[in-house]
Design a protein with these regions (language model features):
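N-terminal hydrophobic/helix-forming segments and targeting peptides
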Residues: 1-343
């Protein structure tokens, strides 16, 4: 699978360059649709905007669904303030603590986009004596537009209005040592991994014995991405989403994480065991962990009433929902587990 790591990382980098906070995902949807079709696979856009791909396979009675998501965290304009600054609310789990001082774009509905920065209100240390002690929250930060605006009317004249999306700069970098740093690796890195796996199937002429579908969802960050569009015959679903890295967990950015349990409860025991067996068969560097604060697309699938077994794997990602970090080795090990699970 080493031959497909560069492709997977490159496609993730390309997708990371496309703004796609939940609710504003059309360009990302088109990218995913185009890339899977370019590899020769049948792909279609669902009514919700997700991309459903048929990756081939023989038996349709025991089909497998792989799920990843292209939507990310972000913000939305909630108020145009009298001084021309913007009060925003978070979309998904965007956190004001790590979004402070980040460049962003305000995407208007009809008048293009405008650059700005998320700053603490009264952000100058030499002026604000409470700078260090102020708790960062969505009530204490604001978007400062890079436009000559001094009033709400000035901002409205640009075409900015309540409900416009605020997209944060991902700052994507791939280091010479193989580390991948960016906002929104959750879960665009996994979309790149699924594209890399699709390229492996295409280039190697591999046909799984069971039918395999992929669903790239666009509402995962708000909880209902995987709740629809499960093809007939699917009996198992596996989320390919970021693996947690942090205190009390075993996984590193260079490994593939196999989740045994998260906030929604245990994953299917049989699926977890098969994922571990696949990792061992492929000599993948893996860790099994419990994620204390986490939910996935496949749990949305279950809650929607689908009768399936479920699992979750993903490349280890540190600093989740912030400026995240993973590694090429994590990508490789995830690809290895996918191959071992199906072949």
């Amino acid at each position: 699978m080493e031959n497909y790591v560069d492709f997977a990382v490159q496609k993730a980098v390309e997708l990371l360059a496309i703004d796609s906070p939940t609710g504003y995902t059309a360009e990302a949807e088109e990218f995913v649709l185009r890339e899977f079709r370019a590899l020769g696979f049948a792909a279609e856009r669902t009514a919700k905007g997700g991309i459903l791909i048929d990756l081939g396979g023989e038996s349709t009675d025991d089909a497998l669904l792989l799920e990843a998501h292209a939507d990310t965290l972000g913000g939305m304009v909630a108020e145009i303030k009298g001084d021309g600054r913007l009060r925003i609310v978070n979309v998904g789990g965007m956190n004001a603590n790590n979004a402070e001082a980040e460049n962003c774009r305000v995407v208007t509905k009809f008048s293009g986009s405008y650059e700005g920065t998320l700053q603490l209100i009264n952000a100058s240390v030499h002026v604000n004596g409470d700078y260090a002690s102020t708790k960062r929250s969505w009530d204490t930060v604001e978007v400062v537009l890079d436009e000559a605006v001094e009033s709400a009317d000035d901002v409205k004249a640009l075409g900015i209005s309540v409900g416009d999306f605020v997209c944060f700069e991902p700052r994507t970098r791939v280091t010479k040592s193989g580390y991948i740093k960016s906002r929104f690796l959750d879960d665009k890195l996994s979309v790149g991994i699924l594209l890399g796996f699709a390229k492996y199937l295409h280039d190697e002429g591999k046909t799984p014995t069971r039918r395999v579908y992929a669903h790239v969802t666009v509402y995962e960050e708000v909880g209902h991405g995987g709740s629809a569009s499960v093809p007939a015959g699917v009996t198992e679903a596996i989320s390919v989403d970021m693996g947690c890295v942090g205190a009390g967990l075993q996984c590193t950015e260079r490994q593939v994480s196999i989740c045994a349990k998260d906030s929604g409860g245990p994953y299917s025991y049989d699926v977890v065991k098969k994922l571990i067996a696949a990792a061992q068969k492929e000599h993948a560097d893996y860790a099994v962990d419990i994620y204390p604060y986490y939910g996935s697309d496949v749990e949305a699938t279950l809650r929607a009433g689908y009768d399936i077994r479920h699992g979750l794997i993903g490349a280890g990602v540190y600093a989740s929902h912030g400026y995240e970090r993973s590694h090429r080795d994590g990508v490789l090990n995830t690809l290895r587990v996918l191959r071992g699970y199906l072949f």
